[in-house]
Amino acid sequence: MEMVDIASPTGSEKDMAAYLERRMSRAGLKTTLQEVSAGRPNAVGTLHGTGGGRNLLFTGHMDTSYDGDEEFLTGEGFKAKAVFRDGWIWGLGASNMKSGLACALVALEAIAEEGISLPGDITLAGVVGEIEKAPIEEFQGEYFAGYGTGSRYLITHGITADYAILAEPTSLQVSNANMGCIWARISTGGTMAHSAYGKNPGHVNAIEEIHHIQTALLDWAPGYSERHAFMGERPSVTIAAVQGGLRWRLSRNPFEASLYVDVRTVPGQKADDVKRELRAVLQRVAGERNMPEAELIFYVNDPPTLLDPELPIIKTMRTAHEEVTGTASEPVIRLPAADSTHFNRYDIPCAVYGPGGFNHSDAGTWMHAAGEHVSVENMLTAARVYLVAALKICSQRPA
């Protein structure tokens, strides 16, 4: 609950990093605050082993999905103030993913307190800038520097491991795969003219042209999702924002307009495959409308990722889960973005497993509408699974 009480929106993770570093240092870990950018440190702590064993990295992001003071978000699950009720913790970051970080921290504290000696090192890293945000147009600065900013810095500035466990919310399921994401901007031009003459022959309304493109994208999206079904899930296409015209001067014909599309991708897809599909839609609309092809740019390309389920990290996590819970965990694919993409790309095979993701009965079936919350019982389960997995992995010696 202490972590939830520390506000840590993207770009303002410093206080959370300081808290995590203090806890790790108190437990006897060798700690450092790794400055990613001014005022944005990753918090890293290592419990060194005797040497010669496999090294394990627990990791998770410290930034939260929201600031906690948005007027359009009400309820205790959207605020940086923890509330405990009926065995559940409610508050911003409770599920995504301070609960996972807390469970990993408790597992390391237990190993350190018991004086357990392992051949391998165990590291815990709380990272900045994971939330799905990206700079575009006037939206610039640290607040928009998400999508793996901290994890990429962590990996490329000296933190290594044989395997990683990412404590993202998975409802206590072992995940070996993650969808990727592309954010695209599609823009059209129009005629600068007074609105009173907007219907003159030859005048083009950019918003009307965007409307035709939007209709075509909505027609294309279901087929895209079906063609790329993977591990029982289908990647979504979401028209997430639209912009055009002069809101302060409606007496002017819209001479520019854009729509912004979130396209989820699955392992095996490449960004240029998606670009070709989108351009085919735009070219078809241009031909039907006898207009120039709309401009298409990508400003996020977060690739999908997939690990062989037979890799030791996945098998060990499944075994640990079964030993703790008595139930099997078949590998699943996660739909939202996650930093496992970056660890896998840098040859640190990363399993994803965390206590968040379950919904309290008060929340119905959709946490994003009710606010974040997590079961303490599920946190205890995750901490035990992390402990068992760490003991197994860090006791192994490479062949």
What feature does the model see in each segment?
Residues 1-94, 113-118, 357:
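Acidic/His- and Gly-rich active-site-bordering loop/insert found
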Residues 3, 7, 168, 210, ...:
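Residue-level signal for inorganic ion chemistry
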Residues 89-102, 115, 204-207, 373-380:
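Short, conserved micro-motifs enriched in small and acidic residues
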Residues 185-399:
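Metal-dependent amide/peptide-bond hydrolase catalytic core
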Residues 97-179, 398:
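Acidic/histidine-rich catalytic neighborhood of metal-dependent amide-processing enzymes
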